[in-house]
Amino acid sequence: VSGIDIAALRRMVTTIEGNDPQGSFANQGQTDFGRTRSFTLGLAGADAAFPHGLAGDALHEVFAENPGAHMAATGFALAFAARAAERAIEPRRPIIWIEEESAASEYGGLYPPGLHAFGIDPSRLLIVRCPTAQDVLKAANDALEAGTGGKASHLVSGVVASVTGQPKCLDLTASRRLLLATETAQLPVILLRSHRTAVQSAAVSRWRVAPAPSRSSGANAPGKPVFSAVLERNRHGTCGQWIMEWNNETQEFGANERDGRTSVSRPLVSVSADRPASQQRSA
């Protein structure tokens, strides 16, 4: 697809929530508009870099340190979106995940059992696949512009837009357009990129992510997902670097204390079920 069918989106949201489609949106104009929500990540050191919290109505950028780290960046973006969704105007609404069709075949797609293990209910994700990066950006803007007067924030709790490579369409102007749309919609957008780029961006925060060793949970079994995260840009605070462990039970980041235990690698949640094991990337 090259855009978002808003009527279909409303029907899907209604199905997920089990609400009457008339009643779900009847009183939107009377609730929550004009409210800006901030959120935290859960790791004290990282949260301290944002004195007023991370903006819940802004564009945040996450990119892989190198092409082999794309799966780690995907997991980080997923966790980031889950944290942001908790503070959304309608936190129970789905997160829209928009990606290029080529990304699933190259890196693997989001896998329901893996999402469960990550602490994310797969039914909360509406996955949209688009032919090109230009279509991904258009679909993201369509989702943010659903309805008028900020009503998108009553349809979804966040948007992740994933692009591969360094498409020319994703320039400073395009990112500014996304930022303005997030502010109007009162929704967070996480722009996930497979490659680092020197192109300027309007994102209020910019994260460079790579996989890090996890603590074994026992019997040399994989532990919780761990990320090496570098905050390269922070419009509302300071920058820094942290080793961040994702807790799938509490759905928050924490410090990765090694405790002298064996460190092991583990597959990321976005590994596709239909790809040979030899092609699956791990963190």
Please provide the spans of the model-predicted regions.
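A conserved mid-domain beta-alpha-beta active-site/ligand-binding segment of alpha/beta enzyme cores
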Residues: 219-237
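Acidic, Ser/Thr-rich peripheral helices and adjacent loops at domain boundaries
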Residues: 116, 203-224
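C-terminal regions of RecA-like/P-loop NTPase motor modules
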Residues: 1, 236-283
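Conserved inter-motif catalytic segment of the P-loop NTP-binding fold
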Residues: 91-158, 162
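Generic beta-sheet signal
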Residues: 98, 190-192, 210
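Detector for small/aliphatic-rich hydrophobic stretches
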Residues: 1-97, 101, 114, 118-123, ...
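A contiguous pocket-lining binding segment that forms or flanks enzyme active sites
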Residues: 148-150, 155-200
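Glycine-rich, charge-decorated loop segments at or immediately adjacent to ligand/cofactor-binding or catalytic sites
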Residues: 105-112, 194-211
